[in-house]
Every structure is written in structure tokens, then in C-alpha cells.
């Protein structure tokens, strides 16, 4: 497994994994009983993409820099890439042009007050901002109350900021908190994989992937699958330590805070009339109470004698 974002090994492994999942029958090609490979051969992908076998072989070996968008589109169609995978392939092509550059520590984007005001205005929904590395960089009181196992985890950084990937793969309690832990793990690894193609020189991102690969066999197996997600929506089931089982719909919205760094606004809501809605409302009451208790007391100036 190649950990170098944008490297030839990354491109090779991604294209080979996508080639292996397509059968000749799915591609409309003749099959043979003596066939030794489960997926498509390189020459078959070349035929489907309208390029020579030699050219596609060179592409799959990682020589992707300078390849035209037309050709990349043809390869994406031949491999039946979805929209996220196609974007990922194009990001890999872009990043391969800068593969020799030294990684740098990217300065975090400051969340402006207007975004925090927006978060705080959503009192009955859990809302937080997540960057491409899956750091939670801002949130409303209900998000902190709902995700309390994550905020209280030993995996938070020195500023008390949780990282979703680090919590899921390095905190044993995550298996209890996320009812469908496997789905959460698959999605989180896929989000990180998309980010390494967008930001191949982000040193903190490389360090995170290296840390997870070293310490978590579960992360390694999911990383090796080369699944990609640009954004993640759906339904999540949580086992909260105070209110019990919650089934929540979550929506991910692009939040434009800078021209380069990716930030998503994540909103968790409950279906009206359900037990989960009642439990989320209870958490919202607790969150509001704790938030008021944490606010400093403002003393009005006393009138003079």
C-alpha cells in the first residue's frame, strides 16, 4: 500500500482496483472459461477507452501527468467510475504534476464569527463544521452534547478539537457509539482518500494517514480498498451514553471558507414524531443549560453613591 498521495503507486493501485471490479460481461466483452483474472485485463480497458494497450499500461503505472481531460474521461467511462471517483482521478492527475514538492503544514482556516452564529442559531439540530482532514473545527452546543464521547476522547488534539477519523479508528469506544461502526469506518477512510488527492502536500494530512495506518489494522484494510467519497449524507445510528439509541438523518453541505481548503457543514436531525426526536430534544435542553452555565457572568456597573 502506497501512502504517498499523488504518487505513481497511488494512481496504479486505484486504477488496478477499479479494473479488477468490472467483469467482461458487465463491459459487454466476450468471456472465456480459461480466463485467469477476475476483472478486466489492461488491453480490454484500452479497447473500451479507445487508446493503445501500451498507452493504458503506461497510464496505470502512474505516468498520468499531462494527460488530457478527454483521455481521462474516456478511461473513467471505461472503468465505470462514479462522479466522486472521476473527480479523484482528475485530482490525482493534477497532483502528480507536483509530486516532487516538499509537504508543508497548511495553516488552518479560521472560522468566521458569522458561521458560529449560524451554528448557534440551530438549537434543535446538531451542527458542526468539518475540514478535509475530518477535524471538527466549530460546532453548536448540541453537537458537543450529541458527540460527547468524541469530544471527551483521549484522541482530541491539544486544543480539545476532535478528529473524526482518529476517534473512529483509535478509540475503542467508537465501536459502541457508532451502531454501524463498519459503515462509519468505510465512509471516513473514503473521505480522507479524497482529501489526499486534493491536498497532496498537506503535511498534517500525511501524518494523520501515517498514524492511522501504523496503529489501526482496521484503517489499513479500508484504506487499501481505495474507496472515495467527496461528501457523505444519509442516516446514522448512535448509542448515546445518556439518552440511548438515536437514529438521525445527516446532511453535508459545502461551506466556502477558502479557495482551497474543503469545509463541510454537517447537520444531524431526527424524524419528527419519533423517539429519536424526543431524545434529541432532551439533549438540546441539556446543551442549552450547559451553554448558559459556561457563559461568563456580566456585571453591570454599579451607580455611584
Predicted features, each with a name:
Residues 1-18, 67-110:
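Short amphipathic recognition helices of helix-turn-helix/homeodomain-type DNA-binding modules
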Residues 32-36, 42-43, 49-66, 76:
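Recognition helix of helix-turn-helix/homeodomain-like DNA-binding domains
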Residues 113-133, 137-305:
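Hydrophobic protein-protein interaction segments
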Residues 16-23, 90, 94, 120, ...:
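Amphipathic, well-packed alpha-helical segments that form the structural scaffold of globular domains
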Residues 26-39, 99-114, 119-121:
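An N-terminal domain-cap segment
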Residues 4, 9-48:
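Short basic helix-loop element that most often maps to the first helix and adjoining turn
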Amino acid at each position: 500500500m502506497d501512502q504517498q498521495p499523488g504518487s505513481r503507486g497511488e494512481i496504479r493501485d486505484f486504477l488496478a482496483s477499479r479494473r479488477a471490479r468490472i467483469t467482461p460481461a458487465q463491459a459487454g466483452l466476450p468471456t472465456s472459461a480459461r480466463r485467469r483474472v477476475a476483472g478486466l485485463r489492461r488491453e480490454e480497458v484500452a479497447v473500451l477507452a479507445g487508446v493503445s494497450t501500451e498507452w493504458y499500461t503506461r497510464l496505470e503505472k502512474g505516468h498520468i501527468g499531462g494527460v488530457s481531460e478527454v483521455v481521462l474521461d474516456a478511461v473513467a467511462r471505461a472503468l465505470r467510475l462514479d462522479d466522486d471517483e472521476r473527480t479523484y482521478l482528475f485530482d490525482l492527475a493534477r497532483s502528480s504534476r507536483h509530486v516532487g514538492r516538499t509537504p508543508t503544514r497548511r495553516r488552518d482556516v479560521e472560522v468566521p464569527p458569522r458561521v458560529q452564529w449560524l451554528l448557534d442559531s440551530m438549537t434543535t439540530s446538531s451542527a458542526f463544521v468539518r475540514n478535509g482532514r475530518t477535524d471538527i473545527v466549530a460546532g453548536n452546543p448540541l453537537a458537543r452534547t450529541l458527540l460527547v464521547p468524541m469530544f471527551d476522547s483521549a484522541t482530541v488534539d491539544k486544543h480539545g478539537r476532535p478528529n473524526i477519523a482518529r476517534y473512529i479508528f483509535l478509540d475503542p469506544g467508537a465501536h459502541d457509539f457508532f451502531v454501524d461502526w463498519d459503515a462509519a469506518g468505510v465512509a471516513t477512510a473514503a473521505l480522507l482518500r479524497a482529501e489526499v488527492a486534493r491536498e497532496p502536500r498537506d503535511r498534517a494530512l500525511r501524518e494523520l494517514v501515517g498514524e492511522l495506518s501504523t496503529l489501526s489494522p482496521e484503517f489499513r484494510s479500508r484504506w487499501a480498498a481505495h474507496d472515495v467519497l467527496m461528501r457523505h449524507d444519509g442516516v446514522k445510528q448512535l448509542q448515546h451514553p445518556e439518552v440511548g439509541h438515536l437514529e438521525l438523518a445527516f446532511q453535508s453541505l459545502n461551506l466556502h471558507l477558502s479557495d482551497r481548503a474543503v469545509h463541510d457543514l454537517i447537520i444531524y436531525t431526527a424524524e419528527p414524531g419519533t423517539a429519536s426526536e424526543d431524545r434529541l430534544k432532551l439533549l438540546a435542553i441539556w446543551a442549552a443549560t450547559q451553554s448558559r452555565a459556561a457563559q461568563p457572568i456580566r456585571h453591570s456597573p454599579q451607580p455611584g453613591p
